[in-house]
Amino acid sequence: MVRGGKGVPAVQQAKYMALAGKMETEVVIKSDGDEILHMFGGKKAHHVPNMVSHHIQNVDLHEGEWGDHGSVKAWTCVVEGKVETYKERVSIDEENKTVHLTALEGTDCLEFYKSYNLIFQIIPKGETKVVKITIEYDKRNKDVPDPQKYLNYLINLFKDVDSKLVQA
């Protein structure tokens, strides 16, 4: 029997690799990158629904304190016109200006994906900054599409939040 990595049969490993994936993109921002991190890392997350209610209708703190590493928040979002809920655990790396959000519960995202992680990183690029958005996921089966709709949603969300922060 041909073995893949970690002693897993090569056929099973190839099947798993086809179900696991990663999507990345970058969004140029004009606002302060730290402000964006605080909006999604938690310290100011409760302000997001007031800024972009067409994307985020509500955010509740379920465990910990706003902005604490390991805190749990529940978001009510509007993705492609459909209301979805998403509960996440937050991991913050202030030094690398990175926020990791690990899905714990979700209406669609965990219905279709066994695991779903969002990573946002603020990266200086010359005169500007970008938010690097990464979605890491593991599909429940081969018929599940890549989470392109969520990537599109996040692109629009970050553009709109950035615009509101610049106007403030």
Language model segments and positions:
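C-terminal helix/juxtamembrane-tail motif
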Residues: 2-20, 148-168
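Hydrophobic ligand-binding cavity/cleft-lining segments
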Residues: 2-68
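Short, surface-exposed coil-to-beta transition loops
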Residues: 22-24, 83-88, 112-119
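Residue-level signal for tight coil/turn positions that link beta-strands
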Residues: 31-33, 94-96, 126
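Glycine-rich portal/gate segments that line the openings of hydrophobic small-molecule binding cavities
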Residues: 47, 57-109
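Beta-strand/loop substructures that line and gate deep hydrophobic ligand-binding cavities in soluble
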Residues: 91, 100-156
